[in-house]
Every structure is written in structure tokens, then in C-alpha cells.
From Swiss-Prot:
CDD domains: GlyRS-like_core (cd00774), GlyRS_anticodon (cd00858). This is Glycine--tRNA ligase. It comes from Staphylococcus epidermidis (strain ATCC 35984 / DSM 28319 / BCRC 17069 / CCUG 31568 / BM 3577 / RP62A). GO terms for molecular function: ATP binding; catalytic activity, acting on a protein; glycine-tRNA ligase activity; protein dimerization activity; transferase activity. Keywords: Aminoacyl-tRNA synthetase, ATP-binding, Cytoplasm, Ligase, Nucleotide-binding, Protein biosynthesis. Belongs to the class-II aminoacyl-tRNA synthetase family. InterPro entries: aa-tRNA-synt_IIb, aa-tRNA-synth_II, aa-tRNA-synth_II/BPL/LPL, Anticodon-bd, Anticodon-bd_dom_sf, Gly-tRNA_synthase/POLG2, Gly_tRNA_ligase_bac, GlyRS-like_core. It catalyses: tRNA(Gly) + glycine + ATP = glycyl-tRNA(Gly) + AMP + diphosphate. Catalyzes the attachment of glycine to tRNA(Gly).
């Protein structure tokens, strides 16, 4: 089926996945709040990432670094000098656009070219395309553009009571630098030998020129990043390892391979620190978008921080007796983007045998579903007994309890929020201590002893 972004956004709002930020005050552009189901979904995604990339990995450990860092960090990392986007303004609408995205949107929507990449083009090359193609502002419909200029993406703030340059700080634009400055602390305290990785999940902030597409590109966002350190010369081998590992993590959690692709960056598209980068992209209803960047950052970050801080980041290899600064592979995943991908991939409208009405269903992997099961008393007269099943299961799983409206409407409601199993407690349950368990995807129903429910769910929702 062809999926519509507006329909998915409306479902997300209606069912409590995502709400507009500051909604009662008219909102704030491009801010979103995760509702009761959205926060459960996103937390389950983060848990699944941490489980596979940190807890179950023989290589990796985790940290949680501060958002506010010494400003020298950003000077050393290159963010103060290099963390810029190409900005262009339409003189009539007074709206500012990111030039490369303006071009890419035009090529996709007007030319049907989904693979055109403007990142890496010079300012002159981008301006020539805009002029030659007659690309217009989506609002004013005019091509009255300024020249393209650099725009630094970091949010500036101040610590203390005075707002002067000595108290200037920045909200971190990525979580990675908190890992790099802690490299020696982690390596020494955990007695790690190469290869090993350090991962973390946390908020980052970028003053994006043209955010949009719901939670895909926002100014406040969450990252799940791993910095994996290895011997120079082995970085491409490890990059390939993490490309496969990341792709399998997505497909194991029910992301369709048909909606995924791996795209290698061209040489002129690479970031200043990278000698090889591959993006795992997802086909959203609005087009292909980056989910996961898997970059070989070489020794750039550790070398920069070594030079600026005076700290020695050389690793003494016990096997070869060499000393060198490790290379780094970075699989960087946006938590909000991948949450959107799971929402889009799970969404379906399906016909129901014997009914003229279609059902809307979210086919989440059970490990990601906000609720693992819903307990549904057939009648409110049975609620006092059915609630005991809820209490029994909710100590181990996220369980919903729903006693309002007909059982059919409750099934549809649970389908629409992606609950894998509905447990119906009926009048026979009072006598035989069994319940009816309905499967979300197949809609098949089986009778099961109440005593077996916990074991059944544990097996079905594991990842």
C-alpha cells in the first residue's frame, strides 16, 4: 500500500504517540512532545539498541556525558569553524532555506530524481543549479534569492549571571564529543584493549535552517551513538562489520528490507574528518532519508583533542609494542528518526474478512510495542476478576486494561496502537480459569490457561 505521511502524523497525534510542542500556546515551530504511547515506543527502541550494541556486545561499554561542555571542546572538534550549513534567503518571502536541501527537494519532486545529492557541491555550483533550474521559493513562488552564506548550527548560551564571551557555552550538536573526551577515562577504568567501543544515548541540539517532516529533522533531537576504536588500517573492515550489524538490527525489529538501502558517500561529500561513510537510508512517505550514518572518522577526533588539550591519546599495543592514536568507526543513529521509521513501517490498512470496513493496524515488533498485551473483560461485571490478570502481568510487562465499548471496537483500538495480544476475560473464565488470546497480526484466537500467560508473553516479546 502507498502510505501517506499526513495520515501517519494524524494517527500519532490522535493515539498519543506524538503531540505538537507547547500546543496550548499555539505551539513552537518544529517541536514535538512524545505522548504516553510515543514515550513507551521510543524507550523500547532505545532499550533494544542498548541491549544489542552495549549489553550483549563483547566490545562495548556505555557512558552518559554532560550536554554542556568546556567550549574548547568545540574548537578542537572543528564545530566552531566547520559546523555550518549553506543558507539562502528568498528576498520576497523573507524565508531562509538550506540550499542543498532546496535543490534536493526540487530534483526529487520536479525531476523525479530521488538519488540526487547536493551535499558536497560548492556554493557556486549550488547557486548555478538554483538559477539554471529556476528553482522558486515554495511560499512566494519567486526566484529572488540572496547569495548562499554559511550558517553555524550550534545553539549558544551562557553560564553564570553575566552574558559575556567568558561565560559563553554551546548546547552540544552531537553526543560523540562527550565520548572522545572520556576516551582515556573509559579505557583505563574498564581496562579495555583495542578494539572496543563506547556508546551513549542523549539529547543534541542543532539550529537547523529548514527542519521539518514531523520528527525526522528537529532542532532538539536524541542520538544513539557508538564510537568504536580500532587499529589504523583495520577501520574499513570494522566499518563493514557495523554496517551489517546495524542493518540486521533494523530488519530483526521488522523494518522491511524493501524500504532500506545503503548509500556510500562520494569523496566530495565526505565530512572533513571521514575517509569513508555509508548511510543506511529509509524510504519514508516523503522520500529517502538518512537513518544511520556509519562513518570512519580516522584518528581525527582523538588527535584534535590531544593537540588542543595536551593529553596523550596514544594507545600502547601490547601485541606489537607499537604506539598509535586509534582510528574510530562511528555508527550514529537518530532516535527520533528511527522512531518515525518504525511508525511508518508498522502502519497498515487492511481488509477484514466478513466486514466491509478496513482496519488500521500498527505491526510493531512485540519488543517495541508500547503495550505488550491488553486485558479486556467481556463485560464490566467481570472487571474485578479481570483486573487481577492485569496486576499479575503488569509487574513484568507494559499492559493495558480496557473495559469500555464493545469487544470489537476494543480490538480495533488495540490494533491501531500496535498491541500484539488481546486477552479477553469472559464468563467462562470464571469457571475454567482460561482466557481467549487474540493475535494482532493474524487475528487468530486461542484459549489459554491464565497460569500460562506470563510464560507465553515472555517468549513472544523477547528480542
Amino acid at each position: 500500500m502507498v502510505k501517506n505521511m499526513d495520515t501517519i502524523v494524524q494517527l500519532a497525534k490522535h493515539r498519543g504517540f506524538v503531540f505538537p510542542g507547547s500546543d496550548i500556546y499555539g505551539g513552537l515551530s518544529n517541536t514535538w512532545d512524545y505522548g504516553p504511547l510515543g514515550v513507551e515506543l521510543k524507550n523500547n527502541i532505545k532499550k533494544a539498541w542498548w541491549q544489542k550494541f552495549i549489553t550483549q556486545s563483547p566490545y562495548n561499554v556505555g557512558i552518559d556525558a554532560a550536554i554542556l561542555m568546556n567550549p574548547k571542546t568545540w574548537e578542537a572538534s572543528g564545530h566552531l569553524g566547520n559546523f555550518n550549513d549553506p543558507m539562502i534567503d528568498n528576498k520576497d518571502s523573507k524565508i531562509r532555506y538550506r540550499a542543498d536541501k532546496l535543490i534536493e527537494d526540487y530534483m526529487q519532486n520536479e525531476k523525479g530524481d530521488e538519488n540526487f545529492i547536493a551535499d558536497g557541491l560548492s556554493f557556486d555550483e549550488m547557486k548555478k543549479i538554483i538559477d539554471d533550474e529556476g528553482i522558486v521559493c515554495p511560499v512566494s513562488k519567486t526566484a529572488n534569492w540572496t547569495d548562499i552564506r554559511q550558517f553555524n548550527l550550534m545553539f549558544k548560551t551562557f553560564q553564570g549571571v553575566t552574558e559575556d564571551s567568558t561565560n559563553e557555552l554551546f548546547l552540544r550538536p552531537e553526543t560523540a564529543q562527550g565520548i572522545f573526551v572520556n576516551y582515556k577515562n573509559v579505557q583505563r577504568s574498564m581496562r579495555k584493549k583495542l578494539p572496543f567501543g563506547i556508546g551513549q544515548i542523549g539529547k543534541s541540539f542543532r539550529n537547523e535552517i529548514t527542519p521539518g517532516n514531523f520528527i525526522f529533522r528537529t532542532r532538539e533531537f536524541e542520538q544513539m551513538e557508538l564510537e568504536f576504536f580500532c587499529k589504523p588500517g583495520e577501520e574499513i573492515e570494522w566499518q563493514n562489520y557495523w554496517k551489517t550489524f546495524a542493518s540486521e538490527w533494523l530488519t530483526d525489529l521488522n523494518i522491511s528490507e524493501d524500504n532500506m538501502r545503503l548509500r556510500d558517500h562520494d569523496e566530495d561529500e565526505l565530512s572533513h574528518y571521514s575517509n569513508a561513510t555509508t548511510d543506511i537510508e529509509y524510504k519514508f512517505p516523503f522520500g529517502w532519508g538518512e537513518l544511520w550514518g556509519i562513518a570512519s572518522r580516522t584518528d581525527y577526533d582523538l588527535r584534535q583533542h590531544s593537540e588542543h588539550s595536551g593529553e596523550d591519546f596514544k594507545y600502547h599495543d601490547p601485541e606489537t609494542n607499537e604506539k598509535y592514536i586509534p582510528y574510530c568507526i562511528e555508527p550514529s543513529l537518530g532516535a527520533d528518526r528511527v522512531t518515525l521509521a518504525f511508525l511508518c513501517d508498522a502502519y497498515a490498512e487492511e481488509g477484514v474478512e466478513g466486514s466491509k470496513d478496513a482496519r488500521t493496524v500498527m505491526h510493531f515488533h512485540p519488543a517495541l510495542a508500547p503495550y505488550k498485551a491488553a486485558v479486556l473483560p467481556l463485560s464490566k461485571k467481570l472487571s474485578s476478576e479481570a483486573i487481577k490478570i492485569f496486576e499479575q502481568l503488569s509487574s513484568s510487562f507494559a499492559i493495558d486494561f480496557d473495559e469500555s465499548q464493545s469487544i470489537g471496537k476494543r480490538y480495533r483500538r488495540q490494533d491501531e496502537i500496535g498491541t500484539p495480544y488481546c486477552i479477553t476475560f469472559d464468563f467462562d473464565s470464571l469457571e475454567d480459569n482460561q482466557v481467549t488470546v487474540r493475535d494482532r497480526d493474524s487475528m487468530e484466537q486461542v484459549r489459554m490457561p491464565i497460569s500460562e500467560l506470563e510464560t507465553f508473553l515472555a517468549e513472544k516479546v523477547k528480542f
